[in-house]
Regions:
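Conserved PLP-enzyme active-site core in the AAT-like
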Residues: 1-56
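Non-catalytic terminal extensions of PLP-dependent enzymes
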Residues: 32-302
Length: 302
C-alpha cells in the first residue's frame, strides 16, 4: 500500500536533469539548425535500415530483419496500407497509420509475417539482455522484435556500435557459446541453473514455450476482449487504503476485482488496471500472464 501511494503522489517531472534536457532539446530544434538535425537523424536511420538488409542478404543462415516497406528511399513517414503485406496487420484503413523512419524495429527469427511460428527462433528478450551487457538500451522489447529510436542524439558512432553488437551476437550465437560468457548478468541470477547451458539451448527453451502457447493467437485473443471495469481506479485504491484487499494466486483471478495494475515488462504495457475484473470472456488475458510466469519459472531471469 505504501509503495502504491508513493508512486501515485511522486513524479519525475521536477527532476532538474529531465527539465534541462527538455529545454536543451527545444532550443536545438529552433530554425534551420533543428531541421538539419532531424534530417540527419532520418538519414542515419535509413542508412542503418539498409545496412541491416544488406547484412541479412550476405549472412550465412539467419540474421536480423527490419519491419519496414520494401522501398524506403523516400525520407517520409511510410503508410501502412491495406493492400500491403509487410506490416502484418489485417483489415486496416488506408492513411490511418504510418511508420516513422526514425523508429527502427528489428525482427529476430521465430515468427513469420503472417503470424505463424517457425521451428527455429531467437526470442528478442535474449538479444536485449546481450545488448544491455554492452551498454545499449532497447527502447521496447517484444517477443521477437526490438525497437530503437534514432533521435537527434544518435550519431554515426552509436549506430555503428549497435551494428557491431548485433553482428557480434550472431557470431556468438552461431558458435553456441555458454550463457555465462554471453550473458554474465543473467548467469549471476542463477549460476547453478545456467552453469553448463549454451545460448542456443536457452533460445530454444523459451521459443518452444512460446510455440506451445501459440503466442500470436493468444495475444490476439487477450487484446480482443478487455477486462470488465467494475469500479474506478480511485475506488479500487480507496479499498486498498482501508485494508479491504487480499492477495490471491494468479490462477484465482477470474471473478476478482484487481486492486493494483498488472504490467508485464517488457514491454511495460498495462494488461489489467485497478478496478478491472478478469471474466471468462477475458480469460485469455490471464492465460497470457500465466505463459509469462511459466517462462520465468522455466528460465530464471525472464
Amino acid at each position: 500500500t505504501f509503495n502504491e501511494a508513493y508512486m501515485m503522489h511522486t513524479t519525475p517531472s521536477p527532476h532538474y536533469g529531465i527539465v534541462a534536457s527538455t529545454e536543451t532539446a527545444a532550443a536545438m530544434m529552433k530554425g534551420n539548425a533543428g531541421k538539419r538535425l532531424i534530417n540527419g537523424s532520418i538519414e542515419r536511420a535509413i542508412k542503418f535500415r539498409k545496412e541491416i538488409k544488406r547484412l541479412r542478404t550476405e549472412s550465412d543462415g539467419w540474421f536480423f530483419d527490419v519491419w519496414q516497406p520494401d522501398h524506403i528511399d523516400t525520407t517520409e513517414c511510410w503508410p501502412l496500407r491495406s493492400d500491403s503485406t509487410w506490416h502484418g496487420f489485417k483489415n486496416i484503413d488506408n492513411e490511418h497509420m504510418y511508420l516513422d523512419p526514425i523508429k527502427v524495429t528489428l525482427l529476430t527469427p521465430g515468427m513469420e509475417k503472417d503470424g505463424t511460428m517457425s521451428d527455429f527462433g531467437i526470442p528478442a528478450s535474449i538479444v536485449a539482455k546481450y545488448l544491455d551487457e554492452h551498454g545499449i538500451v532497447v527502447e521496447k522489447t517484444g517477443p521477437y522484435n526490438l525497437l530503437f529510436l534514432f533521435s537527434i542524439g544518435i550519431d554515426k558512432t552509436k549506430a555503428l556500435s549497435l551494428l557491431r553488437a548485433l553482428t557480434d551476437f550472431k557470431r556468438a550465437f552461431d558458435l553456441n557459446l555458454r550463457v555465462k560468457n554471453m550473458l554474465p548478468s543473467l548467469y549471476r541470477e542463477d549460476p547453478e541453473f545456467y552453469e553448463n547451458m549454451r545460448i542456443q539451448e536457452l533460445a530454444q527453451n523459451i521459443h518452444k514455450l512460446i510455440v506451445h502457447h501459440n503466442l500470436p493467437d493468444l495475444m490476439y485473443r487477450a487484446f480482443e476482449v478487455l477486462p470488465t471495469m467494475v469500479m474506478t481506479p480511485y475506488a479500487a485504491f480507496q479499498k486498498e487504503l482501508h485494508g479491504m484487499t487480499e492477495e490471491v494466486y494468479l490462477d484465482e483471478m477470474v471473478g476478482r476485482i484487481n486492486a493494483n495494475m498488472i504490467l508485464p515488462y517488457p514491454p511495460g504495457v498495462p494488461l489489467v488496471m485497478p478496478g478491472e475484473m478478469i471474466t471468462e470472456e477475458s480469460r485469455p488475458v490471464l492465460e497470457f500472464l500465466q505463459m509469462l510466469c511459466e517462462i520465468c519459472a522455466h528460465d530464471p531471469g525472464f
